[in-house]
């Protein structure tokens, strides 16, 4: 097995980056592709009371355990199996269980700050930024956090205005300049997704 092709997919909350990642994932046989979500690498907070965990800024680079993420990416590149953490968004903490991820020909890393850390960027073969209007992103974030993460409307809006938007402007939007490809309209941009798939297949044939 050759060195895997590492693809980083980033963009603001609700931009459609997960949709793009899944669209690319579904174009390949499951035996040759793996997905790594940056959300899985939020820091372990077992020593912090729940009330304090609720107040944390989860859109700041310091919220992520990039040391572990980088170690896992390097292990996958070296064709080693990893134990990916599982993050509980309602408890704001990692679960005790992990998910075994085996090395594959293609590794997709998806998350809001994938291109922010230079040590992560240098491991990536393809860097993608998914660009979507802010009003579309906030509506998607609202629906997701209420339906999937047990949040209230007021808490989501307050978090967006005080944390999510400022962090987007400070860290996520500036990381766009590191992207090889910028995809507008998120996962609905079929032409861009098909172009990415063709590019990945080309890299695999080298």
From Swiss-Prot:
One of its GO terms (molecular function) is cytidine kinase activity. Keywords: ATP-binding, Cytoplasm, Kinase, Nucleotide-binding, Transferase. The keyword Cytoplasm applies. Disulfide bonds: none annotated. Its EC number is 2.7.1.48. Its main location: cytoplasm. It is an enzyme of class 2 (transferase). Coiled coil: none annotated. It is found in: Cytoplasm. Belongs to the uridine kinase family. NCBIfam families: PRK05480.1 (NF004018), udk (TIGR00235). This is Uridine kinase. It comes from Clostridium botulinum (strain Langeland / NCTC 10281 / Type F). The gene is udk.
